[in-house]
Each structure stands twice: as structure tokens, then as C-alpha cells.
Amino acid sequence: MNLQFGMPTLIENRTLEDNIALCTELGLNFIELNMNFPEYQIDKLENTSYFADAARKAGIYYTIHLDENLNIADFNPLVTDAYLETVRRTIDVAKKFVDLRDTYGNRVQPLVINMHMHHGIFITLPDRKVQMYERDFETYIKSFHRFRELCENWIGDAPIIICVENTDGFKNYEQKAIEFLLESPKFRLTWDIGHSKAVGEKDVPFLMNHHDYLAHFHIHDGSENPPKNHLALGEGEIDINERLGIAEKQNCRCVLETKTIEALRKSVKWLNLRDSN
């Protein structure tokens, strides 16, 4: 199998060097730098020579995971502008990492910046909850028009894509916004197979209806009842081989997105045993 496998930023590792040491020990190709961590905030990532030099010594490259709080459709323009500026600067960082991908990765695969969709707030009525983005969809979707245009300009002709990841079930208004983003070649999809399993595979119809846009996978095991994810491969209910088959067919990168070092080691061992049979 020609899939490229990487690892997430792990909370047990306090430094970049700790993550790189584990990545190389396990024979993985890349690390997904997670901007939820203080050590990987944009001002830290902009020290690109430090990150690039460390990667070259180890023979690996990076993808980037944007802050999960990122909300480019916030009704407060000050908040939205701050997040948009974060995306702009992250794209500039990613451009500095393209050479690492060219040297240690697969040039055919664009460099990925991963993002979540922010559900926004909801108002609780006596009989139901109303999502504000659904109520004010026109305002919401205008933000995505602006976001797409800005990202297209910022990325330019660089081999970089922004991949939208499923989490706990795309809302209807989010699906419409994602479909608008996917009209641009600068946007694609991340399939997090553990997230989709833990919510009863509710995102699978949408993802499979747009399977040609899949470019990135977060691979970890999970279960529906009780809902669990980020398990080591082989410890849940997911048909991992079937999901990897889709990833390979679509030429996707795969992050082994467990949350502990132990689970990551088990997952790499599972893959090695699988490939040896």
C-alpha cells in the first residue's frame, strides 16, 4: 500500500523534538501540527526555519491542523477578522513547508491545512433549539463567500489545500457552506473515521456523495454504543481496511489520530501486522 501515514501532535509530548523522535521511531512520514496547543500557535509556527530544520534532520514533513475554535462566520467582525488573519498567516507558513513535502512526501498530494466547521451558538426555546447560523443563513453563507475568495488569493498557485473535517455531524447549513467551498480547487474534505463512527455514521452519506473531494483522513478506531473514538486500530468496531481502501483510492494522506503514545504504537503495530500478512 502506498499510503503515507503521519501522527498527530500528542499532549504527552511537550516539545517538537519529542514528537519528531516518536514519529521517526515509528517510521511515520509526517506530523500534523495542532494549533490548539500553545507551542504551535501562529507566532510560534512562523519560526519556520526552526520547524523546517528539525524536520529535515528527521526526514519528515508537516501538515497543519487549525485551531478548533476557528470561526470565520462569527457575527462579531472583530472575531472573524482575527480568525481570517490566522488563516492567512497559516497559509504563509504552509508555503514554507512545501519543500519538506517535496523532499520527504508525495508531490502529487497537496499540503493540507485541516479545519473544523464551527456550529455557532444556539438559542434554547421551550420546545426546541434554534441554531443561529440556520436562522441567519444568508449572513452565514456570505462569510463563506468571503472566506473562499480570500483563501484562493492567499494560496495562489501554491500546492496547498484546506480540508474540512467532520466532527460530530455536519449541520444542514454547514453542508451547504461546504459544498460552496468545494466548488474551489483550494478546498477538499477530511474524513475522520472515528468521529463518524461515534455519531452513528451520520456524516458518511455526505462524505460518500462527495468522495471525489476526499484528500485527507484521520484514522483511529471507534464504536457507536457506547460512542468512543481515538481508539487504537483494532480496538473498536470500524472496518479499518475498508476505510483505508477508500483513502488509497482517493490518494489521501492518513493521520493515525490516536490521543496517546501507547495507542499510536498499537496502531502502527496493527498496520505493520496487516501489511505483513
What do the PLM-derived regions correspond to, one by one?
Residues 1-92, 102, 188:
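N-terminal pre-domain/capping segments
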Residues 1-2, 30-34, 40, 130-132, ...:
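A generic short-segment signal for beta-strand/edge and adjacent turn/coil regions
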Residues 2, 13, 17, 21-24, ...:
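Histidine-acidic metal/acid-base catalytic patches
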Residues 6, 55-59, 66, 130, ...:
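A near-ubiquitous, low-amplitude feature marking generic local secondary-structure context
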Residues 8-12, 34-38, 67-71, 118-120, ...:
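Active-site beta-loop-alpha junctions enriched in small/polar residues
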Residues 32, 63, 114, 163, ...:
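Conserved beta-strand positions in the central sheet of alpha/beta enzyme cores
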Residues 56-61, 72-188:
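Active-site acidic/histidine proton-transfer and metal-coordination neighborhood
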